[in-house]
Regions:
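Active-site-proximal loop and beta-strand segments within enzyme catalytic domains
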Residues: 1-53, 60, 69, 77, ...
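Loop/turn elements at helix/coil->beta-strand transitions in domains of secreted/extracellular proteins
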Residues: 4-5, 86, 219-222
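Generic structural signal for secondary-structure transition and capping sites
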Residues: 12-16, 40-41, 84-88, 149, ...
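Catalytic loop of the DD-peptidase/beta-lactamase superfamily, centered on the K-T-G motif
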Residues: 19-20, 27, 64-77, 81, ...
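Juxtamembrane helix-loop transition sites at the ends of transmembrane segments
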Residues: 34-37, 89, 105, 154, ...
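A broad, low-specificity signal marking well-ordered, structured residues that form hydrophobic/aromatic
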Residues: 41, 49, 88, 187, ...
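Aromatic/pi-system hotspot detector in well-structured domains
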Residues: 56, 107, 216-218
Length: 276
């Protein structure tokens, strides 16, 4: 039997990315859910990792069934409002209504071109339906670091940030890197150790023309959020480049700006298209 914990830890046992193709085809969430009984199990629930979008979004149905409030309303009231995430919202309409929204861009082979924002992933809010500014994400980062205990208690954070199911580097979408180990998935978060430090928490996001990365370490009280309305390939190295710079900063007596300049690449290397 699949539990809420299985859903949140991507360990339902179902075939990975079940019906993500139907999300891409713009099929409604309700229609997709009715087909989930056709999806095969690759292991018993809790026994293996398999990333999901549609299956993860069943969390929203659980919230609605237990609170009488839809997922969007529940998160707005319990998270966005108390954390003062003033521009955070759900849905394509809210995104387009924000006068300062960033338009997505894709690489054509010679230049970046603006592309259309679609409804596809907005149909599964728990997995991919949130809009937020960098200021909003800063508040979310601080809450994850334990600075908003009324909203996210220490016990809640500890449970979210603890390993539930082990993952391989490939499953975690990490390249081999010296010092990287103990990759796992908690409740909605990827987890890893790096170098001498344990307990890093991470997740990235991608929809056409947009990328995001958020990583932090509660024990070290450090973290980063990066949002871009494009698809630069350097995003794949961003988290670990940041950690290398952070480690050097901790060990060095040089000013931070000197270290940062050392990490900058020539302009021709800074932005290249993401391969498909």
């Amino acid at each position: 039997e699949i539990s809420l914990k299985h859903l949140m830890s991507q360990s339902s046992g179902l075939m990975p990315h079940a019906y993500t193709n139907l999300v891409e085809d713009n099929m409604s969430y309700d229609r997709i859910v009715k087909r989930l009984n056709r999806v095969d199990f690759i292991c018993a629930p809790g026994e293996c990792y398999g990333y999901q979008n549609v299956v993860f979004s069943l969390v929203g149905d659980v919230v609605a069934a237990n609170t009488g409030v839809d997922y969007e309303g529940f998160v707005t009231r319990k998270t966005f409002e108390p954390l003062n995430m003033a521009r955070a919202s759900f849905g394509r309409a809210a995104f387009l209504d924000d006068p300062k929204h960033a338009r997505p861009h894709i690489w054509t082979g010679s230049h970046w071109r603006e592309t259309r924002t679609t409804d596809h992933y907005y149909r599964i809010p728990p997995a991919a339906g949130v809009n937020a500014s960098i200021e909003d994400m800063t508040q979310w980062l601080l809450a994850q670091l334990g600075h908003e205990p009324v909203v996210l208690s220490s016990d809640m954070l500890s449970e979210m940030h603890s390993p539930v199911i082990r993952t391989t580097l490939r499953q975690a979408h990490y390249k081999r890197r010296r010092g990287l180990g103990n990759t796992a998935y908690g409740l909605g978060w990827r987890l890893f150790d790096y170098g001498e430090d344990a307990g890093f928490v991470h997740h990235g996001g991608y929809v056409k023309g947009m990328r995001s990365e958020m990583m932090f370490n509660p024990r070290l009280q450090t973290g980063m959020v990066f949002l871009t309305n494009s698809e630069p390939s350097q995003m794949n190295n961003l988290v670990f480049d940041f950690l290398d710079l952070y480690r050097e900063f901790r060990q060095s007596s040089e000013p931070a700006i000197v270290l940062m300049n050392r990490y900058q690449k020539p302009a021709s290397q800074q932005v290249t298209p993401v391969g498909r």
